């Protein structure tokens, strides 16, 4: 569901940053903002979200954002839809390089995924949201979840078993024996 504005933003205007010392930050969104972030990411719950680090100069024009992301997320189990709680603790590094050309093709493979072109404004809140999104378990599963498998088949036919699906040519010999011998 697209939004006009992200649920959390903490911008740093690059031109206003001190050129010789790091700018430290400690972002802890409040309950309302955390609820908005959880809704934006499709989470059941989000607690203890914290993004702490610094934005420091690297050379004459480049910048490095280095931070630690901490959060406790609650997602729905992919099997039972029961709540699954996961603790996230991830280091985050982004390097902003002046003069880095934006790739023009629709899909481009970047050699280093932490390198980005230097924008006029570095949004630590957007970096936090991106890092949280990437750190989420893609298929959360409750400890007691048991996936017995799907048993789907056309009407009047028996569903395939695991043995039948792992041995696709198992019935080939029987079919050849039933044949009339003509080739």
Give the residues covered by each predicted segment:
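A positional/architectural concept
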Residues: 1-70, 74
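Short, intrinsically disordered, mixed-charge
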Residues: 39-46, 79-85, 134, 177
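Charge-rich, low-complexity linker and terminal segments
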Residues: 1-20, 24, 95-183
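Charged, alpha-helix-enriched surfaces in structured cytosolic catalytic cores
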Residues: 28, 32, 68, 72-75, ...
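Helix-adjacent hinge/juxtasegments
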Residues: 64, 68-105
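A structural signal for short, well-ordered beta-strand segments
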Residues: 27-29, 51-53, 67-70, 88-96, ...
